[in-house]
Design a protein with these regions (language model features):
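C-terminal functional extensions of proteins
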Residues: 235-292
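Solvent-exposed alpha-helices and their adjacent loops that cap or buttress functional pockets
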Residues: 101-103, 132-134, 156-157, 174-178, ...
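Short, intrinsically disordered low-complexity segments enriched in Ser/Thr with adjacent Pro
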Residues: 7-13, 17-20
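Short gly/pro/ser/thr-enriched loop/turn and capping motifs at secondary-structure boundaries
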Residues: 169-175, 212, 240-243
Length: 292
Protein backbone atom coordinates (compact mmCIF):
# COMPACT_ATOMS: atom_id res chain seq x y z
CA UNK A 1 0.00 0.00 0.00
CA UNK A 2 1.28 3.45 -0.92
CA UNK A 3 2.34 5.83 1.81
CA UNK A 4 -0.38 8.31 0.77
CA UNK A 5 -3.05 5.61 1.03
CA UNK A 6 -1.78 4.54 4.43
CA UNK A 7 -1.94 8.15 5.62
CA UNK A 8 -5.49 8.57 4.33
CA UNK A 9 -6.65 5.40 6.05
CA UNK A 10 -4.99 6.45 9.30
CA UNK A 11 -6.76 9.82 9.12
CA UNK A 12 -10.10 8.12 8.48
CA UNK A 13 -9.60 5.80 11.46
CA UNK A 14 -8.71 8.76 13.65
CA UNK A 15 -11.85 10.67 12.64
CA UNK A 16 -13.98 7.58 13.21
CA UNK A 17 -12.51 7.13 16.69
CA UNK A 18 -13.13 10.79 17.49
CA UNK A 19 -16.71 10.58 16.25
CA UNK A 20 -17.49 7.63 18.49
CA UNK A 21 -15.99 9.38 21.51
CA UNK A 22 -17.98 12.55 20.86
CA UNK A 23 -21.15 10.48 20.62
CA UNK A 24 -20.39 8.80 23.93
CA UNK A 25 -19.86 5.39 22.36
CA UNK A 26 -16.96 3.00 22.59
CA UNK A 27 -14.64 3.61 19.61
CA UNK A 28 -13.82 0.65 17.34
CA UNK A 29 -10.22 0.33 18.60
CA UNK A 30 -11.44 -0.09 22.18
CA UNK A 31 -14.08 -2.60 21.13
CA UNK A 32 -11.41 -4.64 19.32
CA UNK A 33 -9.13 -4.34 22.32
CA UNK A 34 -12.01 -5.52 24.47
CA UNK A 35 -12.50 -8.57 22.28
CA UNK A 36 -8.81 -9.44 22.33
CA UNK A 37 -8.57 -8.96 26.09
CA UNK A 38 -11.77 -10.89 26.75
CA UNK A 39 -13.79 -7.93 28.06
CA UNK A 40 -16.53 -8.27 25.46
CA UNK A 41 -16.65 -12.01 25.97
CA UNK A 42 -16.96 -11.45 29.71
CA UNK A 43 -19.86 -9.06 29.10
CA UNK A 44 -21.65 -11.60 26.93
CA UNK A 45 -21.07 -14.42 29.40
CA UNK A 46 -21.63 -12.50 32.65
CA UNK A 47 -23.92 -14.17 35.21
CA UNK A 48 -27.53 -13.32 34.44
CA UNK A 49 -27.95 -11.52 37.78
CA UNK A 50 -24.66 -9.59 37.54
CA UNK A 51 -24.89 -5.82 37.18
CA UNK A 52 -23.93 -4.65 33.70
CA UNK A 53 -22.26 -1.65 35.36
CA UNK A 54 -19.43 -3.94 36.43
CA UNK A 55 -18.50 -4.46 32.77
CA UNK A 56 -19.34 -1.24 30.95
CA UNK A 57 -16.62 1.42 30.91
CA UNK A 58 -17.63 4.72 32.55
CA UNK A 59 -18.52 6.56 29.35
CA UNK A 60 -20.86 9.55 29.37
CA UNK A 61 -24.22 8.79 27.76
CA UNK A 62 -26.22 11.22 25.63
CA UNK A 63 -28.82 11.55 28.40
CA UNK A 64 -26.15 12.45 30.94
CA UNK A 65 -24.64 15.04 28.62
CA UNK A 66 -28.05 16.65 28.29
CA UNK A 67 -29.06 16.56 31.95
CA UNK A 68 -25.87 17.30 33.84
CA UNK A 69 -24.89 20.88 34.68
CA UNK A 70 -22.57 22.80 32.40
CA UNK A 71 -20.21 25.66 32.96
CA UNK A 72 -20.10 28.80 30.88
CA UNK A 73 -19.62 28.13 27.19
CA UNK A 74 -16.16 28.96 25.92
CA UNK A 75 -15.56 30.54 22.49
CA UNK A 76 -13.50 27.52 21.49
CA UNK A 77 -16.27 25.02 22.30
CA UNK A 78 -17.52 22.86 19.44
CA UNK A 79 -21.12 23.96 18.71
CA UNK A 80 -22.15 20.36 18.05
CA UNK A 81 -21.48 19.58 21.71
CA UNK A 82 -23.74 22.32 23.07
CA UNK A 83 -27.35 22.06 24.25
CA UNK A 84 -28.87 24.03 21.33
CA UNK A 85 -27.31 21.52 18.94
CA UNK A 86 -28.61 18.63 21.03
CA UNK A 87 -32.13 20.04 20.67
CA UNK A 88 -31.76 19.63 16.91
CA UNK A 89 -30.53 16.07 17.36
CA UNK A 90 -33.41 15.28 19.71
CA UNK A 91 -35.83 16.74 17.17
CA UNK A 92 -34.34 14.53 14.48
CA UNK A 93 -34.97 11.47 16.66
CA UNK A 94 -38.61 12.45 17.11
CA UNK A 95 -38.96 12.98 13.36
CA UNK A 96 -37.41 9.61 12.53
CA UNK A 97 -39.61 7.83 15.08
CA UNK A 98 -42.80 9.54 13.94
CA UNK A 99 -42.01 8.92 10.29
CA UNK A 100 -41.16 5.24 10.77
CA UNK A 101 -44.13 4.43 13.00
CA UNK A 102 -46.78 6.56 11.27
CA UNK A 103 -48.17 3.57 9.28
CA UNK A 104 -48.76 1.59 12.50
CA UNK A 105 -52.53 1.58 13.11
CA UNK A 106 -52.57 -0.42 16.33
CA UNK A 107 -49.76 -1.82 18.43
CA UNK A 108 -49.02 -3.23 21.86
CA UNK A 109 -45.75 -2.70 23.67
CA UNK A 110 -44.41 -5.59 25.72
CA UNK A 111 -41.95 -4.87 28.52
CA UNK A 112 -39.97 -7.23 30.73
CA UNK A 113 -36.57 -8.41 31.80
CA UNK A 114 -33.75 -8.90 29.33
CA UNK A 115 -32.39 -11.59 31.68
CA UNK A 116 -34.96 -14.26 30.82
CA UNK A 117 -33.87 -17.24 28.73
CA UNK A 118 -35.85 -19.19 26.12
CA UNK A 119 -36.41 -22.05 28.58
CA UNK A 120 -38.16 -19.78 31.10
CA UNK A 121 -41.95 -20.00 31.46
CA UNK A 122 -42.14 -16.20 31.25
CA UNK A 123 -40.45 -16.28 27.84
CA UNK A 124 -43.02 -18.80 26.60
CA UNK A 125 -45.90 -16.75 28.00
CA UNK A 126 -44.64 -13.53 26.40
CA UNK A 127 -44.23 -15.28 23.06
CA UNK A 128 -47.75 -16.72 23.23
CA UNK A 129 -49.32 -13.42 24.30
CA UNK A 130 -47.64 -11.60 21.43
CA UNK A 131 -48.66 -14.30 18.97
CA UNK A 132 -52.33 -13.98 19.94
CA UNK A 133 -52.21 -10.21 19.60
CA UNK A 134 -50.41 -10.39 16.26
CA UNK A 135 -53.07 -12.75 14.94
CA UNK A 136 -55.66 -10.16 16.03
CA UNK A 137 -53.94 -7.55 13.87
CA UNK A 138 -51.74 -5.78 16.42
CA UNK A 139 -48.14 -4.87 15.80
CA UNK A 140 -45.80 -5.77 18.66
CA UNK A 141 -43.31 -3.23 19.96
CA UNK A 142 -40.43 -3.88 22.36
CA UNK A 143 -37.11 -2.40 23.37
CA UNK A 144 -35.52 -4.72 20.76
CA UNK A 145 -33.32 -6.54 23.26
CA UNK A 146 -33.13 -10.14 24.51
CA UNK A 147 -35.28 -11.93 27.09
CA UNK A 148 -38.95 -10.95 27.24
CA UNK A 149 -38.42 -8.49 24.40
CA UNK A 150 -37.07 -11.22 22.14
CA UNK A 151 -39.93 -13.52 23.12
CA UNK A 152 -42.54 -10.91 22.22
CA UNK A 153 -40.92 -10.11 18.87
CA UNK A 154 -40.72 -13.82 18.13
CA UNK A 155 -44.41 -14.19 18.97
CA UNK A 156 -45.23 -11.34 16.61
CA UNK A 157 -43.45 -13.11 13.80
CA UNK A 158 -45.17 -16.41 14.59
CA UNK A 159 -48.50 -14.58 14.48
CA UNK A 160 -47.60 -12.99 11.13
CA UNK A 161 -47.73 -9.52 12.64
CA UNK A 162 -45.38 -6.56 12.45
CA UNK A 163 -42.46 -6.86 14.85
CA UNK A 164 -40.99 -3.50 15.94
CA UNK A 165 -37.94 -2.81 18.07
CA UNK A 166 -37.10 0.57 19.60
CA UNK A 167 -33.46 0.14 20.53
CA UNK A 168 -31.52 2.40 22.88
CA UNK A 169 -27.85 3.03 22.13
CA UNK A 170 -25.64 2.13 25.07
CA UNK A 171 -21.95 1.23 25.45
CA UNK A 172 -21.49 -2.45 24.59
CA UNK A 173 -25.18 -2.76 23.72
CA UNK A 174 -26.30 -6.35 23.21
CA UNK A 175 -27.80 -5.50 19.83
CA UNK A 176 -31.20 -6.10 18.29
CA UNK A 177 -32.77 -9.51 18.71
CA UNK A 178 -33.20 -11.55 15.50
CA UNK A 179 -37.01 -11.36 15.47
CA UNK A 180 -37.32 -7.61 14.90
CA UNK A 181 -38.50 -6.56 11.43
CA UNK A 182 -38.49 -2.78 11.94
CA UNK A 183 -35.86 -1.22 14.19
CA UNK A 184 -35.38 2.38 15.28
CA UNK A 185 -32.27 3.38 17.23
CA UNK A 186 -32.52 6.10 19.87
CA UNK A 187 -29.89 7.98 21.85
CA UNK A 188 -32.37 9.40 24.35
CA UNK A 189 -34.59 7.36 26.64
CA UNK A 190 -37.34 9.97 26.79
CA UNK A 191 -37.72 10.05 23.00
CA UNK A 192 -38.07 6.29 22.91
CA UNK A 193 -40.63 6.35 25.74
CA UNK A 194 -42.72 8.83 23.77
CA UNK A 195 -42.84 6.38 20.86
CA UNK A 196 -44.00 3.55 23.11
CA UNK A 197 -46.86 5.63 24.51
CA UNK A 198 -47.88 7.37 21.29
CA UNK A 199 -48.09 4.28 19.10
CA UNK A 200 -49.33 1.70 21.62
CA UNK A 201 -52.90 0.75 22.42
CA UNK A 202 -51.80 -1.06 25.58
CA UNK A 203 -48.80 -2.06 27.67
CA UNK A 204 -48.18 -5.62 28.79
CA UNK A 205 -45.72 -5.69 31.65
CA UNK A 206 -43.87 -8.93 32.33
CA UNK A 207 -41.58 -9.37 35.34
CA UNK A 208 -38.61 -7.06 35.08
CA UNK A 209 -36.37 -4.59 36.84
CA UNK A 210 -36.04 -0.82 37.12
CA UNK A 211 -36.66 -0.12 33.44
CA UNK A 212 -39.83 -2.22 33.43
CA UNK A 213 -41.07 -0.54 36.61
CA UNK A 214 -40.34 2.86 35.10
CA UNK A 215 -42.54 2.13 32.09
CA UNK A 216 -45.27 0.65 34.32
CA UNK A 217 -45.59 3.63 36.61
CA UNK A 218 -45.30 6.19 33.83
CA UNK A 219 -48.25 4.58 32.04
CA UNK A 220 -50.29 4.47 35.26
CA UNK A 221 -49.50 8.14 35.92
CA UNK A 222 -50.60 9.18 32.42
CA UNK A 223 -53.88 7.29 32.85
CA UNK A 224 -54.43 8.62 36.38
CA UNK A 225 -53.93 12.21 35.24
CA UNK A 226 -56.17 11.86 32.19
CA UNK A 227 -53.46 12.15 29.57
CA UNK A 228 -54.50 8.85 27.94
CA UNK A 229 -57.76 6.87 28.02
CA UNK A 230 -58.86 3.29 27.33
CA UNK A 231 -55.25 2.20 27.76
CA UNK A 232 -54.95 -1.25 29.38
CA UNK A 233 -51.97 -1.96 31.59
CA UNK A 234 -51.64 -5.72 31.94
CA UNK A 235 -49.21 -7.02 34.57
CA UNK A 236 -48.30 -10.59 33.72
CA UNK A 237 -47.27 -12.92 36.57
CA UNK A 238 -49.44 -12.93 39.69
CA UNK A 239 -46.75 -14.32 41.96
CA UNK A 240 -44.12 -11.83 40.82
CA UNK A 241 -46.35 -8.77 41.20
CA UNK A 242 -48.15 -9.91 44.38
CA UNK A 243 -45.79 -8.08 46.75
CA UNK A 244 -46.11 -4.81 44.84
CA UNK A 245 -49.90 -5.05 44.74
CA UNK A 246 -50.05 -5.75 48.49
CA UNK A 247 -47.81 -2.74 49.17
CA UNK A 248 -49.98 -0.48 47.03
CA UNK A 249 -53.06 -1.58 48.99
CA UNK A 250 -51.56 -1.68 52.47
CA UNK A 251 -49.36 1.39 52.31
CA UNK A 252 -50.05 3.72 49.39
CA UNK A 253 -53.85 3.39 49.42
CA UNK A 254 -54.16 3.25 53.20
CA UNK A 255 -52.16 6.47 53.52
CA UNK A 256 -54.41 8.05 50.86
CA UNK A 257 -51.62 8.66 48.39
CA UNK A 258 -53.84 7.18 45.67
CA UNK A 259 -57.57 6.65 45.23
CA UNK A 260 -59.26 3.21 45.32
CA UNK A 261 -60.06 3.56 41.62
CA UNK A 262 -56.37 3.90 40.80
CA UNK A 263 -55.85 0.26 41.71
CA UNK A 264 -58.37 -0.70 39.05
CA UNK A 265 -56.10 0.66 36.34
CA UNK A 266 -54.13 -2.61 36.30
CA UNK A 267 -55.06 -6.12 35.27
CA UNK A 268 -52.92 -8.85 36.83
CA UNK A 269 -53.01 -12.23 35.11
CA UNK A 270 -51.15 -15.45 34.36
CA UNK A 271 -53.12 -16.22 31.20
CA UNK A 272 -51.93 -15.09 27.74
CA UNK A 273 -55.49 -15.39 26.40
CA UNK A 274 -56.87 -13.15 29.16
CA UNK A 275 -54.15 -10.58 28.53
CA UNK A 276 -54.83 -10.54 24.79
CA UNK A 277 -58.61 -10.36 25.26
CA UNK A 278 -58.29 -7.39 27.62
CA UNK A 279 -56.26 -5.51 25.03
CA UNK A 280 -58.60 -6.37 22.15
CA UNK A 281 -61.75 -5.42 24.11
CA UNK A 282 -60.24 -2.10 25.21
CA UNK A 283 -59.19 -1.28 21.66
CA UNK A 284 -62.70 -1.95 20.37
CA UNK A 285 -64.19 0.24 23.12
CA UNK A 286 -61.73 2.98 22.28
CA UNK A 287 -62.54 2.77 18.58
CA UNK A 288 -66.28 2.96 19.30
CA UNK A 289 -65.97 5.96 21.64
CA UNK A 290 -67.19 9.25 20.13
CA UNK A 291 -64.50 11.63 18.93
CA UNK A 292 -64.50 15.00 20.67
Amino acid sequence: MAVAEQGALAGLRERTEEGHLKAGRVPPSQVEHGRQSGAVKILEERPIDQSIRDYIPPLITEDEKLLRGHGARQPSDDFTRTDPWRVLRITSEFIEGFDTLAPVEKAVTVFGSARVGPDDAQYTAAQETARLLAEAGFAIMTGAGPGIMEAANKGARLGHGRSIGCNIELPFEQGTNPYVDTVINFRYFFVRKTMFIKYSSAFIIFPGGFGTLDELFEALTLIQTGKIYHFPVVMFGRHYWAGLIRWLHARVLQERKISPGDLELMLVTDDPAEAATAVIDAFEARSAAPRV
